Amino acid sequence: EFEEYLANHPFNQREHLTPKQWKKKLVKKDRPDLAWEQDFLMTMDPAIKTVPKERLFEAYQYAEELRASMPVNRDASWTEHGPSNVAGRSRAMMFDPNDFENKKFWAGSVSGGLWFTDDITVSNPTWIAVDGFWENIAISTMAYDPSNTLVFYVGTGEGWGNGGAVQGNGIFKTEDGGNSWTQLSSTMGDDTFDFIQKIVVDENGNIFAATRPGYWWGGNGGIYKSSDGGNSWAQVLTGSTDYPKGADIEIAADGALYASLGIFSTDGLFKSVNNGETWSQLNSESNGFPSDFERIEIACAPSDANIVYALCAGGS
């Protein structure tokens, strides 16, 4: 049964080339999906035909128990040797809404976790790391709830297909302004939430997340909505491809939602004026916006709800 499953798996339906043929045919861009393919085939459980992510968490907890039981030389002296002049990628940044002086600032690294400083205005701010032993530290997006500014949401996973991308594992939440955090069980161990490209929260506390699945054959990305603080989610925009990938979502000054799908395939730019219940596609060629873009990043002018910017990229 397992051999039949592998034979019919999408990976075995595509063209397989020799290394020499790959060099001639493979496009000149990062292809982490090929590494994900190999990783999937090496780590999947034949009995359930998928990767048992819940066991990874159990193994992590067991490793922590072993580490805690080992003797530690607390008198050891450490000296940092750097490098200290090279910054990693930071895709998530946010001024703390509870600091009316606009000094406290949050920043998330795609492979280095979540950090904050109490005073971003000084020339050399002191940065403090939030618990570095989160189940996942690939921080990709961050947002707060306008209806309760003590509530923050942090998404994980860098899903742009670059070679250094780190896969995520759902969304984290704080209800006390960042003092303590929990991982939303509704997003844990689910391929749909392996890469959270963007999170926004409207004035009523509704959460919208642009997601893409961890592997191109699994999960079901797109735009998801939660109206209960992240306890449950509903897909509100799926696009036109077999494996939809949410790229971005923004809220305009009048509350309208703008979302983009695609990333590695042409899908589109969409708008909703009823909290994500229905959507209209904007890149229809007839209005001057081309329909063949793959990745689309969006920005809405806070001063004018009628002004929307779209930064686009094609396959080449």
Model-inferred region functions:
Residues 1-316:
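Extracellular glycan-interacting surfaces
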